[in-house]
Swiss-Prot record:
Protein name: UPF0718 protein MJ0584
Protein species of origin: Methanocaldococcus jannaschii (strain ATCC 43067 / DSM 2661 / JAL-1 / JCM 10045 / NBRC 100440) (Methanococcus jannaschii)
Matching InterPro entries: DUF318 (IPR005524)
PANTHER family to which the protein is assigned, alphabetical: UPF0718 PROTEIN YRAQ (PTHR43299:SF1)
UniProt keywords, alphabetically: Cell membrane, Membrane, Transmembrane, Transmembrane helix
Subcellular location: Cell membrane
Ranges annotated as spanning the membrane: 6-26, 32-52, 67-87, 108-128, 130-150, 174-194, 201-221, 245-265, 282-302, 308-328, 344-364
Gene Ontology CC terms, in alphabetical order: plasma membrane
Length: 365
């Protein structure tokens, strides 16, 4: 009996270690690096008033939520990679509503994932995923703003309008962030959707890695020419500060997610998420909210679960909750927003994903 328990524990530990190793592959480490550098750039280079102008709680909702949803959807990133960017804009004065809309929309309204879902699961599922993801991102943001309205009033800053994104020429700031943004897109590009970028050049060295290096050199040269040494130091300091806060929590969360996968196998999950009951959709949403899905990996996993008997509704619930949330996300959000707001965000993601999954199950049955 003791041997069985020890074997079980050792298996879980082994899975956790392997999950961390798989997580820390070259492409993901580079993607996280770019996310932290972009976040550090937002914190140090962007005029604080400019962020408040478009993301602040006093900004008209049709502007702040549209900007938040669109900004997030342009990033083909997972729930972990979006965290440093979310932490940065919230720290700089973004309202909790637009900030959490941005947090959800990054992984959930991922344009690449939407098309990949359509290609692998069917265009009806892909289309509904896109519609529900936009709606849910805004509903979550509005709900967070309403629930924590009193706290946001205390936090809101009355600042003059900011017409400039920064004190330097606009083209320099745009180039600085555009290069990092393109580097992030290049390194996270799916080989299924962009096979050319994954063309091997030498022993695991791909075309995307060469392009990443070239863009990195251009970024380094332009930054050195345009920015003062003190500005560069502040940028790197802010990036490293975020790295120290977020990265350990990501690793802990990924390990826990790996343990959950070891304890609850997909075939076992599938038996409880067949059909289209509220319970089945809730279970799918809740499990999706705890498990970690790297960018685009949720699609083949859900396809496999559907082949094992998962209903269309629970599959949609998992498509919405899975990529947008995970244990690493919850742990990190609690550090940025506090435990109450983090758990509220978790609850809202699960609730809205459950409802949308149930509706999808009715529409697509």
């Amino acid at each position: 009996m003791k041997m069985d328990v020890m074997s079980f524990i050792m298996n879980i530990i082994n899975v956790m270690i392997n999950t961390i190793i798989d997580y820390l592959n070259v492409n993901r480490v580079l993607a996280l690096l770019m996310a932290f550098l972009m976040a550090g750039g937002i914190a140090s280079m962007i005029n604080k008033n400019f962020i408040i102008k478009y993301f602040g709680s006093n900004t008209p909702k049709y502007i702040s939520y549209t900007v938040a949803a669109v900004s997030g959807s342009l990033l083909a990133v997972c729930s972990c990679t979006i965290l440093p960017l979310f932490a940065s804009i919230y720290k700089r004065g973004a309202g909790i509503g637009p900030a959490t809309t941005f947090l959800f929309s990054g992984p959930a309204i991922n344009v690449l994932a939407i098309f990949y879902s359509a290609a692998l699961l069917g265009w009806d599922i892909g289309f509904l995923r896109a519609v529900f993801a936009v709606v849910v991102s805004i509903l979550i943001g509005l709900s967070m703003e309403i629930i924590f309205k009193s706290h946001e009033k205390k936090r809101a800053l009355r600042v003059p309008k900011a017409d400039k994104i920064s004190d330097r020429p606009l083209y320099q700031t745009i180039t600085f962030f555009a290069l990092q943004f393109i580097m992030l897109l290049v390194i996270t590009a799916s080989p299924k959707l962009f096979p050319t970028l994954s063309m091997p050049l030498y022993d695991g060295f791909l075309l995307k890695h060469l392009l990443f290096i070239i863009l990195g050199i251009i970024l380094a040269v332009t930054t050195k020419i345009w920015f003062k040494d003190e500005e560069i130091k502040n940028w790197l300091r802010e990036s490293f500060t975020l790295l120290k806060i977020v990265f350990p929590l990501l690793i802990i969360g990924v390990a826990i997610a790996g343990a959950i996968k070891a304890i609850i196998p997909p075939s076992y999950i599938a038996t409880y998420v067949g059909g289209n009951s509220i319970t089945a959709n809730f279970i799918a949403s809740f499990i999706g909210a705890l498990m970690y899905f790297a960018t685009l990996t949720e699609v083949p996993i859900i396809k496999a679960l559907m082949e094992l008997g998962m209903g269309v509704g629970p599959a949609m619930a998992l498509l919405l909750a899975g990529p947008s949330l995970s244990i690493p996300t919850v742990l990190t959000i609690s550090k940025v927003l506090g435990k109450t707001k983090a758990l509220t965000y978790l609850g809202l993601v699960v609730i809205f994903s459950t409802i949308c999954g149930y509706i999808a199950g009715i529409i697509l049955r």
